[in-house]
A protein has these predicted regions:
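A generic secondary-structure signal for well-formed alpha-helical elements
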Residues: 72-76, 131, 135, 151-159
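Short, glycine/acidic-rich hinge or "gate" loops at secondary-structure transitions
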Residues: 77-90, 139-142, 161-168
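Short pre-active-site segment immediately N-terminal to the catalytic Zn-binding motif
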Residues: 107-123, 135-141
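Active-site recognition of the HExxH zinc-binding catalytic motif
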Residues: 121-134, 145-149, 153
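Post-HExxH zinc-binding segment in Zn-dependent metallohydrolases
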Residues: 142-181
């Protein structure tokens, strides 16, 4: 369907609500295409003229988490957690971690790590903790990290979870995980 007039997005959707520590997200466009721009960097960097929350991590998180939910809904259509919005907190002023505590939490870059809200494998891993907490056996089950890694590995079709967590160039003859953590 073609849109007439203006359209506005706030990245508050049916399944994911983005909350960015850099500011609120609201972008309006005329016509059928919403171009959110390209940010010039990481953390709180935004495209020229954009709202303060139009960060790389908010845009990436909204996309990646919604894709993970779409896949899961096709396998678990009766799971109520997959049908209700979850808050995702982006650019939290800390580093080298991410988490799930009923909400998703992703940290800014620093301390030798990249922004965890800009890495598809980290989104999928943290989503895996949420799914583990809301599956047929509620609560985080042992081995929780293994379950979360499995979800990320299956979605991205890779054995290296969280690639680019550390800002280093990895080698390893096709297996970039041999020197990365």
């Amino acid at each position: 369907a073609c849109l007439e007039g203006d359209s506005t997005t706030t990245l508050n959707g049916r399944y994911i609500t983005m909350q960015d520590s850099c500011g609120s997200f609201s972008e309006t466009a005329s016509g059928p295409i919403q171009n959110l721009g390209t940010s010039a960097g990481t953390d709180c960097a935004i495209p020229a003229g954009a709202s303060a929350g139009n960060t790389h991590s908010s845009r990436s998180g909204y996309y990646e988490l919604n894709r993970m939910i779409e896949v899961a809904q096709s396998y678990l259509p009766e799971n109520s957690w997959l049908r209700n919005p979850v808050i995702s907190n982006m650019n939290i002023n800390d580093n080298c971690n991410a988490g799930y505590n009923g909400q998703f939490v992703f940290f800014t870059s620093g301390g030798g790590c990249n922004n965890t809200g800009e890495i598809a494998g980290v989104f999928d891993h943290e989503w895996g903790h949420g799914m583990d907490d809301h599956d047929a056996n509620p609560g985080i089950q042992s081995p929780g990290e293994g379950i979360a890694d499995t979800y990320a590995s299956l979605r991205l079709n890779t054995s290296c979870i969280g690639r680019n967590f550390k800002p280093i160039v990895c080698d390893g003859f096709g297996d970039a995980c041999t020197e990365c953590t």
